[in-house]
């Protein structure tokens, strides 16, 4: 009989695997973290350099470059990493595809580099959340909640440009660029009249309201463990088994403030609701962005309301239509893209008789 005795010394690979998957590290790395760290570092470094020093980008593909960096006159509000050129469209445009670095910069190559590495990095962040939960024996709902902002990022940085046919339609990486993206999105897709966007607004404002209500109710029903001269926060010890607040008192207060069944009497179902409400609403909003990417737009009321005599009855829809047209004609004003809403009307003759030539 042969007995194999293995040396107690671990190989370099085994030591690396143990370090990556160890939950005793101050910051958990994980296998997803091995990919997350370099991709997010690449995105952050390229974003910083481009925000400071990138030359103007021919975003519309008409040889009229738009400057977005500090060195070309912008500040923290107006600056942005400008999306890649409309001349590139949906082509993958790494630096080796350009004839020179100058051409790559002129066509907005840094935008694709930042966005693609960022999307890979945040996907790895989600995987790392699941991985750490798995190692600790926790349930996986943290990464499920994180999937809501993840879906929003994919909607505006990937799905919308794909649906529109060019990465130049992606959201610029800057403050004013984000607002410009929002205004153009409203002008072209009437997002404010899309029910999925309305659900997202309810999720954001509702989530903020529920969070404030929950925090204030808990803070108002703490079980006093200290004297009047001490802070109530000293009455809590990290890891204690006892409840730190009286859920019965909070339930009774809120049930009388509104009505009985508006208040939760189960702490677990309450916290599930606090997590599920904004997450599901953001999922639906991301789905709305993804459908509008392919021009399945919000409701429109292009035909005004008329009375019995055929006169226009002014409504809020008319105001919204006019504002949309105004934003649309200001967008890409030098690219000669006339709004289809205006171009679809009958042409108005400017001369009764065509002049004779010669």
Swiss-Prot record:
Among the GO molecular function terms of this UniProt record, one is: electron transporter, transferring electrons within the cyclic electron transport pathway of photosynthesis activity
Q: What is catalysed by this protein?
A: 2 a plastoquinone + 4 hnu + 2 H2O = 2 a plastoquinol + O2
Q: EC number(s) for this protein?
A: 1.10.3.9
How would you classify this enzyme at the top EC level?
oxidoreductase
Q: Where does chlorophyll a PD1 bind?
A: 197
- Indicate how the chain sits in the lipid bilayer: Multi-pass membrane protein
Span-the-membrane segments of this chain are 28-45, 117-132, 141-155, 196-217, 273-287
Q: Site positions for Cleavage, renumbered to this chain?
A: 343-344
Q: Which UniProt keywords apply?
A: Calcium, Chlorophyll, Chromophore, Electron transport, Herbicide resistance, Iron, Magnesium, Manganese, Membrane, Metal-binding, Oxidoreductase, Photosynthesis, Photosystem II, Thylakoid, Transmembrane, Transmembrane helix, Transport
Per UniProt, subcellular location reads as:
Cellular thylakoid membrane
Instruction: Quote the record's binding site residues for a quinone.
Output: 214, 263-264
Assembly notes: PSII is composed of 1 copy each of membrane proteins PsbA, PsbB, PsbC, PsbD, PsbE, PsbF, PsbH, PsbI, PsbJ, PsbK, PsbL, PsbM, PsbT, PsbX, PsbY, Psb30/Ycf12, peripheral proteins PsbO, CyanoQ (PsbQ), PsbU, PsbV and a large number of cofactors. It forms dimeric complexes.
> Which PANTHER family does the entry mention?
PHOTOSYSTEM II D2 PROTEIN, PHOTOSYSTEM II PROTEIN D1
Q: What is this protein called?
A: Photosystem II protein D1
Q: Which organism is it from?
A: Prochlorococcus marinus (strain MIT 9303)
